[in-house]
């Protein structure tokens, strides 16, 4: 077997960015896109301050999270370990971007050129197939394939070696077959101390960092400690976690509408078994879910390829959500039209499956620590049920004949609001204990009191008063339901668009140049407290 890997010598890298320029020239990327870039990290505190230069890019993981979430199979892995993107079937959903913990993927929504209008050389080399889709480092796979076809050795022969490695003036970048014990990279990894970035996430990256000679006194390598640090410092910009940008309000709308719509349908279906007059609300629920999906369609880079989202149900939760929707809408429509109990229950189960899929979509995004927590799934599910039940209350408020039903539904919604608040509390506690970017907690924590007051305490008080003073029940239940629904929508909006800071970059060890010893670990912008 062959597994191509790259090794960066942190003692040799001088931060000249020649590899970045070579990559840009070789691959004709847009000015703001750097498949290979070099981080400039300050280590220590005055007066003992040093700088470490760290080349980063796609790690070509053995277990790539980007490939697992891709709904279209555009992201694939070759037998030699190189992770590729098929630009012709990528829809530009950016799911792979939020799943990558190395910030190695880019999505260019429209062509950009260095000086505004395109120059002739830019026109000639521009690759329009990359516009609106994901792109990243390819390890210069075309050069590797050329070399193998012509009997050359990638990593040793320049014509079959990645451009960044060829251009490195300090001989800090190396490329070769990590599965070959006699290769150049295998020898380096045996003779030098090394680590891999974010290895604790289980991605098995193919990019190694060496930082000195082995010795008997050094402690064994361990996972990077979550070192508390002040977020937003100038010296850690570009290194600490940054807010993801591609999943914006349009993506948040899908989670909001999906939760409200499926939750409302579940209430409508089960209540409709005994009160058929409420079944018309089910069509409103379907319209809300459809609205969220329609807004999402406007977000993707290549919307005309949306049908490709159905290609990978075996791995991608986004594909599973789409397949569930494909069966959910016709079955739910038929169930509401006929009122058949079996169809109503079946459609309600599909609605629950759709809601669960939305939670799993976030959980599978390994690149966003606030999403990959297992507790995000119960938070999304309970929030969806509470939102749907909350909207159900004002919907039935104008009908006096449904007053006894409203009282029972209000009690159920109150319980769901309590469960949602419990899920929220457990979720925040889990984030603090597991470790997340400092700014994620800075965003989420201020909303705790607001969420509990407006999304739990006030609605429960209104429901309690309405249950005692029956003459005020309908308006109070309606207001309580709206409070619960709005609180859930706000939580999802914040979670998707405001608290979604990426993994950032981290070094298990930093080199002490010339000593062969390891320095301190670096993980700026993170905290466990």
Predicted features and spans:
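Juxtamembrane/interface segments at transmembrane-helix termini
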Residues: 300-303, 426, 493-506
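Alpha-helical multi-pass membrane segments and their bilayer interfacial helix-loop junctions
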Residues: 248-252, 293-296, 300-301, 498
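Membrane helical hairpin/interfacial module
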Residues: 264-324, 331
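Juxtamembrane interface elements at the cytosolic ends of transmembrane helices
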Residues: 217-235, 240, 302-307, 355-366, ...
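Non-ligating segments of multi-cofactor redox enzymes
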Residues: 1-247, 256, 272, 287, ...
């Amino acid at each position: 077997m062959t597994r191509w890997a790259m090794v960066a010598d942190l003692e040799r890298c001088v931060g000249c960015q020649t590899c970045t320029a070579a990559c840009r020239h070789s691959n004709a990327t847009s000015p703001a896109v750097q498949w290979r870039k070099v981080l400039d990290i300050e280590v220590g505190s005055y007066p003992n301050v040093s700088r470490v230069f760290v080349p980063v890019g796609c790690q070509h993981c053995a277990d790539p999270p980007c490939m697992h979430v891709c709904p279209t199979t555009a992201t694939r892995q070759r037998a030699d370990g190189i992770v590729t993107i098929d630009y012709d079937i990528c829809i530009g959903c950016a799911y792979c971007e939020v799943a990558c913990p190395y910030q190695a993927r880019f999505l260019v929504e429209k062509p950009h050129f260095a000086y505004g209008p395109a120059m002739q050389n830019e026109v000639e080399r521009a690759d329009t197939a990359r516009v609106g889709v994901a792109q990243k480092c390819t390890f210069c796979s075309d050069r590797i394939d050329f070399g193998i076809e012509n009997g050359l050795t990638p990593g040793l022969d320049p014509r079959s070696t990645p451009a960044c490695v060829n251009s490195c003036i300090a001989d800090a970048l190396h490329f070769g077959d990590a599965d070959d014990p006699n290769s150049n990279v295998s020898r380096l990894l045996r003779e030098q101390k090394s680590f891999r970035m974010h290895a604790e996430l289980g991605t098995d990256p193919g990019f190694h960092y060496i930082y000195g000679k082995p010795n008997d006194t050094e402690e064994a390598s361990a996972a990077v400690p979550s070192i508390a640090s002040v977020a937003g410092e100038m010296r850690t910009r570009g290194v600490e976690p940054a807010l993801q940008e591609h999943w914006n309000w349009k993506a948040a709308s899908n989670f909001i509408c999906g939760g409200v719509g499926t939750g409302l349908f579940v209430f409508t279906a089960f209540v409709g078994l005994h009160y058929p007059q409420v079944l018309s609300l089910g069509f409103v629920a379907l319209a809300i879910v459809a609205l969220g999906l329609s807004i999402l369609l406007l977000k993707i880079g290549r919307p005309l390829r949306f049908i490709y989202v159905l290609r990978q149900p075996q791995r991608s939760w986004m594909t599973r959500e789409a397949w569930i929707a494909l069966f959910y809408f016709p079955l739910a429509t038929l169930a509401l039209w006929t009122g058949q109990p079996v169809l109503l229950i079946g459609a309600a189960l599909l609605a629950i499956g759709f809601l669960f899929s939305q939670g799993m979509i976030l959980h599978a995004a390994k690149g966003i620590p606030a999403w990959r927590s297992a507790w995000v799934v119960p938070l999304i599910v309970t929030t969806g049920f509470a939102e749907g039940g909350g909207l159900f209350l004002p919907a039935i408020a104008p009908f006096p004949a449904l007053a006894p039903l409203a009282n029972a539904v209000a009690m159920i919604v109150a319980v769901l609001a309590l469960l949602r608040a419990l899920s929220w509390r457990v979720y925040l506690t889990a984030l603090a204990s597991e470790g997340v970017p400092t700014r994620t907690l800075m965003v989420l924590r201020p909303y705790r009191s607001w969420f509990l007051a407006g999304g739990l305490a006030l609605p429960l008080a209104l429901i309690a008063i309405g249950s005692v003073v029956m003459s005020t029940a309908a308006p109070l239940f309606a207001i309580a339901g709206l409070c619960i629904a709005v609180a859930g929508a706000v939580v999802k909006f914040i979670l998707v668009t405001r608290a979604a800071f990426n993994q950032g970059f981290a070094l298990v060890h930093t080199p002490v140049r010339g000593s062969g010893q390891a320095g301190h670990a670096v993980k700026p912008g993170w905290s466990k407290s």
